[in-house]
A protein has these predicted regions:
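Cys/His-rich microdomains that often coordinate metals
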Residues: 225-229, 254
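Short metal-binding segments enriched for Cys and/or His
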Residues: 249-270
Length: 271
């Protein structure tokens, strides 16, 4: 029997975009300031991959690009696809997504004359890993080592050559871009499952439907949504004592928002 999702269930989209480089006239290499009259072509989105994230499941990613268009740098149709995809998204999963992917996507919506979308919460796997700390590198390639799905290197077209060959309409470069883009999304989904129990912050708000806790009279993990939580000790603050819980599925810790002495249902928040 198919389980019906709550009416306020989150829609979490794992996403990775690739952009064409900006083209400008320059006189030398090295650090320099480039004025707007030197720019010949601005950076545009040339491809993206995405998958719906669900804790404990790595779903196959889907891919879209401008490769077969007459003008590969005209991203208006691709951006419109992104706009449709994200209009109902409550959360976006992206590595360095807060600093790069979302600003580029939102800027593309503006540039293409589309309506603004309500900003989704960004589940940035790079920022979550930085919260944990102590890693030699926070690049996706490093953090996903040893995973079932790891970040793919584009060694067939190393460095910038993947993008330059893609723009030359090399079909092998398009195949490599598809594999590279899709692997990033699938690797991010697996990485999110690993860092989720360790991370904390307001980005988790809405991952668990509010109606779920009210209807079932049960505690739910605010990270993965599991009802399989166990009361483990208490958290004490100047305001009083709160019940603490550990999720038996993802391993994350959470606490009640209400004092222990109050006989009210518990709503959980990350700590």
């Amino acid at each position: 029997m198919k389980v019906r999702k709550p009416h306020d269930a989150p829609r979490v989209i794992a996403l990775d975009i690739e952009t064409a480089p900006c083209v400008a006239y320059v006189w030398r290499t090295g650090k320099q300031a480039i004025s707007i009259d030197q720019i010949q072509q601005e950076s545009t989105i040339i491809s993206f991959s995405w998958a719906e994230w669900e804790f404990g499941k790595v779903k196959k990613a889907s891919y879209a690009s401008t490769f077969d268009q007459e003008d590969q740098r005209d991203d208006s149709k691709l951006v419109a696809q992104l706009h449709t995809l994200l209009k109902d998204a409550t959360h976006i999963v992206a590595h360095n997504g807060a600093a790069f992917d979302w600003p580029m996507i939102n800027g593309a919506f503006f540039r293409c004359g589309l309506e603004p979308l309500p900003k989704p919460r960004i589940l940035d796997t790079m920022l979550m890993a930085r919260q944990i700390g102590g890693q030699a590198s926070y690049k996706l390639a490093w953090l996903t080592q040893g995973q079932k799905t790891a970040k793919r290197s584009h060694s067939r077209f190393p460095g910038l050559s993947l993008w330059t060959e893609w723009l030359k309409r090399n079909p092998a470069a398009e195949q490599e871009m598809r594999l590279y883009n899709n692997a990033d999304v699938e690797a991010m989904c697996e990485l999110l499952d690993k860092v989720l129990p360790w991370a904390h912050g307001p980005q988790f708000a809405g991952l668990v439907p509010q109606s779920q806790g009210r209807e079932e009279e049960a505690h739910h993990c605010p990270r993965c949504g599991s009802a399989n939580v166990v009361a483990r000790g208490f958290t004490t603050t100047v305001a009083g004592r709160y019940q603490r819980y550990r999720c038996s599925d993802c391993g994350g810790w959470s606490q009640s928002r209400f004092l222990v002495r109050e006989k009210r249902r518990h709503l959980l928040k990350t700590i």
